Amino acid sequence: MPHSDELDAGDVLAVENLNIAFMQEQQKIAAVRNLSFSLQRGETLAIVGESGSGKSVTALALMRLLEQAGGLVQCDKMLLQRRSREVIELSEQSAAQMRHVRGADMAMIFQEPMTSLNPVFTVGEQIAESIRLHQNASREEAMVEAKRMLDQVRIPEAQTILSRYPHQLSGGMRQRVMIAMALSCRPAVLIADEPTTALDVTIQAQILQLIKVLQKEMSMGVIFITHDMGVVAEIADRVLVMYQGEAVETGSVEQIFHAPQHPYTRALLAAVPQLGAMKGLDYPRRFPLISLEHPAKQEPPIEQKTVVDGEPVLRVRNLVTRFPLRSGLLNRVTREVHAVEKVSFDLWPGETLSLVGESGSGKSTTGRALLRLVESQGGEIIFNGQRIDTLSPGKLQALRRDIQFIFQDPYASLDPRQTIGDSILEPLRVHGLLPGKEAAARVAWLLERVGLLPEHAWRYPHEFSGGQRQRICIARALALNPKVIIADEAVSALDVSIRGQIINLLLDLQRDFGIAYLFISHDMAVVERISHRVAVMYLGQIVEIGPRRAVFENPQHPYTRKLLAAVPVAEPSRQRPQRVLLSDDLPSNIHLRGEEVAAVSLQCVGPGHYVAQPQSEYAFMRR
């Protein structure tokens, strides 16, 4: 039934008194309470808040996707103006009617494109399916339109990408495919749920710019769900702040940033890591934590020196890691991915060395190669005077007691069939270190050390939040008293308060136990906060390395400056240079088998500060 007289002029969406609840052990648990908002055509509304505040379930309720998950949705009004300008009440639509609304009139970009795209269908088939369903196009017409959409989201070689599967694309490319699919039918409303959270800063900047360009072209209303206040400042017209299922403040982006009224909004803004906030400070600094009772305040810097003088605990020289690519009728290796090329660095006890760079720069492969989780083709890895790269499997297992790994996705790295107590105990059992009672006491101590309760040992991973699962992974990494921890994007997908808690925990553990961290991240503001030294990687090579202050306050390499310039700043009035939408993620690091890449030559430009020389820099950046 039409409701055209109930929408205010210019509005494309209006929600009044939305309530969402879930049944848990025969109890109704409220997720969202009395939420009301509107969205105008061509406007971007940012919905912000921490994990569990109700942002994503609100989006799913608008898309009518909560019913299958057992959600209980009640709303006085949920009106949408379709592309045809007809106004409908979403809550009154049948499942069959909603199939025609989703995609055509209201589309959604999900946070994780790998789980949102079907792995058994090509990219072209998935985009074309939506076009055929909503536009009554033939298969040939749908594929032509799918290619046009890939061109529109600046994907290079779109015709080739149409025939590829999701796993064959990078994270940034998959996210752009999701955007192309969502926009393929020119919807009236686009809901973007954390579309850039786990992406590196340059790809994030491209996607934000892309959404703004396409929004202007299509006069779309956009609901942008995020916990990143820098992104909010860059893209939003209005902001809705949610806390524990309720809207606590709403207003223009300038009002929210310059005159926040609610204590939670003020605490949220104060807790945002600001690039440049560490200027003039030599040592890492703890994050302020969010609290309604005590608004976030700056923690003092860690003044004591944690780095121990003497020999480095880890020494890497000319590390080379390549992956074969097979092709042809005989499936021979014809090309190789040069993931890591002649990388060298030292890591001292009590030091945090951060590896930064875009997706595909070789950061994670470097970390995995140090533990021989991937095999390297050259170079030396020396831990406490002993070469890791030549050890037998038995001796390597013993050495892994001293080097532990924290993975990006804690849920994927915990066995869902094991209690977390068993997961933490497993390294102790493998190395035969502690008998039963002592091991149980050790687990209880570790859980308390990472801010959890000893009785949590009997629970399973799915019973914890993302931040709690990451704490469990840290507890497991600490079980063997390691000397080195490799943290691979350990906080990239966590919201600002949980991220602050985890970083503070890592700093406390470093102070107490002298642990050295190799911190792999694309979040430059976090890297600035936690690091003693920083190494910048590009196409598998280190192009700049030095003390954190030198790299951040006086970056010498153009790629380092590019990374820093791409970081969103939580200041909406700041004038930003117009970005050029790049046509690809990174130049290719795929070469013919046997082809050697010129090693970058580093030049000293300050105490401990080394930068790629211009001539060698050109040799690899031109590819």
UniProtKB/Swiss-Prot annotation:
Domain ABC transporter: 15-269, 314-564
Reaction(s) the record says it catalyses: glutathione(out) + ATP + H2O = glutathione(in) + ADP + phosphate + H(+)
Gene Ontology MF: a single term: ATP hydrolysis activity
Disulfide bonds: none
Database matches in Pfam families: ABC_tran (PF00005), oligo_HPY (PF08352)
GO (cellular component) term, any one: plasma membrane
Keywords for this protein: ATP-binding, Cell inner membrane, Cell membrane, Hydrolase, Membrane, Nucleotide-binding, Repeat, Translocase, Transport
Family per record: Belongs to the ABC transporter superfamily. Glutathione importer (TC 3.A.1.5.11) family.
Binding partners and assembly: The complex is composed of two ATP-binding proteins (GsiA), two transmembrane proteins (GsiC and GsiD) and a solute-binding protein (GsiB).
Protein name stated in the entry: Glutathione import ATP-binding protein GsiA
